[in-house]
Amino acid sequence: MNAPAEARRQLDELLGGLRESLGVDLVGLYVHGSLALGCFNAARSDVDVIALTARALADDERFAVVDLFLRVSARPYGAEAHVVAREHLRPWRYPPPYDLHYSEAHRERLLDPDAVLARPQDGDPDLALHYDVTRRAGVALHGPPPDDVFREVPRADLEDALRRDFEWCRSAKSVLYGVLSPCRVWAALTTRELHSKATGGEWALARLPPELRPPVERALTSYAGAGEPVELDEADRQRLLAHIERALAATPAMSQPGPA
């Protein structure tokens, strides 16, 4: 795994803190996302991890783990973390259940003790995508190899999660989620291969008509660079999304035979 020194330090702190808080009940800690896929960008990427535990967290453990995430995240890179127990993986359920979710978007909410103690009532479709990346490309910082832990996600559930992601992207304004994520969904559903935002954007660029390429070209340049702001014309973005939507409508379901 090619990671900046600061990201490695954050991962070491997360692993050390989880070991201290959970002891032998920490089964594994797995890196997924851009670090695992080799497209981490220090200007905009998060440190994505899944912590696997032997059982659901007790109340005092929830406070300790959230405090750890609050201390480590955004110093300097944001942390995106799910805590899942073994019981959440077997039997398979969709959307996948989980015990705790942290991201910088949840930082303020998790300063409230009641929010820390609240057990999630619904699953998270995004976890199906995270499990797929982790199984196929993830890095185990602690615990068994990823493909020994995470079973193959049923194709129908993977497709549903990808299509939900596309729908969510409609209202996203950022380069990552408003342009490159829809391209990644298109590439993943068409090729049935693992794609990052970067590879999805490149794949889409080779298949788009010339008039729809500029938003993707600008997004890829920014994504690969220092996070330079990109001016996106919303009308151009909506035309891009409409084209991808038409392509997705003609794409066979993942449960059907794939491309030869």
Regions found by a protein language model. Name each.
Residues D67-A172, V179:
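Conserved NTP/Mg2+-binding pocket subregion across the NTase superfamily
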Residues N2, T53-L57, W186-L189:
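A generic structural motif
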Residues R163-A198:
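Hydrophobic alpha-helical packing segments in soluble, helical-rich domains
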Residues M1-Y30, D60-R62, S255-A260:
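Helical scaffold of the NTase/Pol beta-like nucleotidyltransferase catalytic core
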Residues E193-S222:
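Short, charged amphipathic alpha-helical segments flanked by flexible coils
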Residues L29-F69, G78-A85:
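Catalytic metal-binding acidic patch
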Residues V185-A188, R192, P210, A250-A253:
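Amphipathic alpha-helical interaction surfaces
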Residues T221-A260:
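Terminal (often C-terminal) interaction modules
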